[in-house]
Design a protein with these regions (language model features):
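Formylglycine-dependent sulfatase
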Residues: 1-178
Length: 178
């Protein structure tokens, strides 16, 4: 069977039409639900995003997962400076999981599936041993560094291992707009 798994930050079960929400239309997700399966008793692995993805992709219990928080690797330089990150991709990204980690996408590839991840990664930095493609995804498009997802109009996203510039101006989060 084809498998599409949607994991969304800060999305509650009561916000989708397929679970009874009536104020905001979600027709495409509702159709996926009608034609597939939904979960009514499903919980994230932790309260924050990168550790939840680590738990989901590795199958490890939160207490044994490699990623315990949305940590930046400050030892690499001025990682909180969005302008510096735009100029130097080596400042981007979170702590990587160990290279020998087996993740669900790698297991699915062994079973003959083609795998893709679209959205936030946050489980390593560009060039590390734990980029999405090195962890089993055939295709990745999105934010390598989850912190970059806090900008409304990102200046770049990643297509597999490479930055793809989007011609959006950098708007640093919490900047007062005129």
């Amino acid at each position: 069977p084809n498998i599409i798994y949607i994991l969304a930050d800060d999305l509650g079960i009561s916000e989708l039409g397929c679970y009874g929400q009536q104020l905001i239309e979600t027709p495409n997700i509702d159709r996926l639900s009608q034609e597939g399966m939904t979960f009514s008793n499903h919980y994230s692995g932790t309260a924050v995003s990168a550790p939840s993805r680590c738990v989901l992709f590795t199958g490890l219990h939160t207490g044994h997962a490699y990623i315990r928080g949305n940590d930046e690797m400050a030892s690499r330089g001025d990682v909180w400076n969005h302008k510096a990150v735009l100029a130097d991709s080596t400042l981007e990204g979170q702590r990587p999981v160990p290279a020998e980690t087996v993740m669900i996408p790698a297991v699915m590839k062994q079973a003959g599936y083609t795998t893709a991840c679209i959205g936030k990664w946050g489980l390593g930095y560009p060039g590390s041993a734990s980029t999405p493609n090195k962890m089993g995804f055939d295709f990745f498009y999105g934010y390598n560094c989850q912190r970059e997802a806090h900008t409304y109009y990102p200046p770049f996203l990643y297509r597999n291992e490479h930055r793809e510039y989007l011609n959006n101006p950098l708007v640093v989060p919490h900047t007062k707009l005129d």
